[in-house]
Amino acid sequence: MKRIGILTSGGDAPGMNAAIRAVTRTALANGIEVCGIRYGYAGLVAGDIFQMTSETVADKINRGGTFLYSARFPEFKEEEVQLKGIEQLKKHGIDALVVIGGDGSYHGALKLTRHGYNAVGLPGSIDNDIPYTDFTIGFDTACNTAMEAIDKIRDTATSHQRVFVVNVMGRDCGDIAMHVGVATGADAIVIPEEPYDIKEIAENLKQGFANGKKHGIVVLAEGVMDANKFKDELLKYGDFDARANILGHMQRGGSPTTRDRVLASEMGAYAVKLLLEGKGGLAVGIENNKLSHHDILDLFDAKHHGNYALYSLNKDLAK
């Protein structure tokens, strides 16, 4: 193996740049050249590929987003399009690939491995929704961003004795909502994985005000319901003032936390180690605080298991 490529795909996540840096410098330290591929699989097919050096990744570890840029490119599911990507890999002398992203990115990595190009996937997703890893790159930063926003929302909620329904990211996974809900002392957490009773939530909020509380916070994962609709449903059972707030894409931005920078660096170096061993079609993770890897194919049949003890804990603490 003389040269590897690296790309970021799908939704961006803080810490991706730290992973790119680790992959690049670990490979270079082992005598392997590195090519950056801009705009994910779309850039691969278009041949938007350039040589990277240690200087290329300097001063990037602290930056959010991905300096290689990203793009959603569902066309890569098609065999004909994959072969165009393979042509570009051959043209640029790339022997293996590191892909940073989520589920769709992993599908692309598996396709390339089946075409004879070893590819290793790193879990880059703020949702923390990828199986066989306790944490994904970007999750911790997203949680801290959401926590800081909700802390500020609590200030104005208290001033006006209001309830705020705060929508956080997590289409199919409630991990951000659970972690942030506990961290901000939310009155209720609503996630896709657990049933909820909106009347019960309203009653608990009313009881809180009756007991002297000056605010109410409901943390709602985006995959459950639109925040404004949830707020309107809540008001059918409560005589309090309520507002909805959608945090949205701010959760994807910002300088990555220490935890995300370290995790991304460890995973990036580990991915290169696997490629040096001639391995491909693998997904890197961290389980019980140890780096691990699994066949990408296994991930598609598995389901991420969140720490649902946090959901139960918050119910107890919110009483």
UniProtKB/Swiss-Prot annotation:
Keywords: Allosteric enzyme, ATP-binding, Cytoplasm, Glycolysis, Kinase, Magnesium, Metal-binding, Nucleotide-binding, Transferase
UniProt binding sites for ATP: G11, R72, F73, G102, D103, G104, S105
Binding site for substrate: S125, I126, D127, R162, M169, G170, R171, E222, R243, H249, M250, Q251, R252
PROSITE patterns listed in its UniProt record: PHOSPHOFRUCTOKINASE (PS00433)
Gene3D superfamilies assigned: 3.40.50.450, Phosphofructokinase domain
Description of activity control: Allosterically activated by ADP and other diphosphonucleosides, and allosterically inhibited by phosphoenolpyruvate.
Family matches, as CDD domains: Bacterial_PFK
Domain of life assignment: Bacteria
Residues bound to ADP: R21, A22, V23, T24, R25, R154, G185, A186, D187, K213, K214, H215
One Gene Ontology cellular component: 6-phosphofructokinase complex
Metabolic or biological pathway: Carbohydrate degradation; glycolysis; D-glyceraldehyde 3-phosphate and glycerone phosphate from D-glucose: step 3/4
UniProt binding sites for Mg(2+): D103
Subcellular location(s) per record: Cytoplasm
GO function terms (MF aspect): 6-phosphofructokinase activity; AMP binding; ATP binding; fructose-6-phosphate binding; identical protein binding; metal ion binding; monosaccharide binding
Main subcellular location: cytoplasm
UniProt cross-references to Pfam families, sorted A to Z: PFK (PF00365)
Entry cofactors: Mg(2+)
UniProt GO BP: canonical glycolysis; fructose 1,6-bisphosphate metabolic process; fructose 6-phosphate metabolic process
EC number: 2.7.1.11
PANTHER family cross-referenced by the UniProt entry: ATP-DEPENDENT 6-PHOSPHOFRUCTOKINASE, PHOSPHOFRUCTOKINASE
Family from the record: Belongs to the phosphofructokinase type A (PFKA) family. ATP-dependent PFK group I subfamily. Prokaryotic clade 'B1' sub-subfamily.
NCBIfam families: PFKA_ATP, PRK03202.1
Function: Catalyzes the phosphorylation of D-fructose 6-phosphate to fructose 1,6-bisphosphate by ATP, the first committing step of glycolysis.
Protein name: ATP-dependent 6-phosphofructokinase
Species per Swiss-Prot/TrEMBL record: Lactobacillus gasseri (strain ATCC 33323 / DSM 20243 / BCRC 14619 / CIP 102991 / JCM 1131 / KCTC 3163 / NCIMB 11718 / NCTC 13722 / AM63)
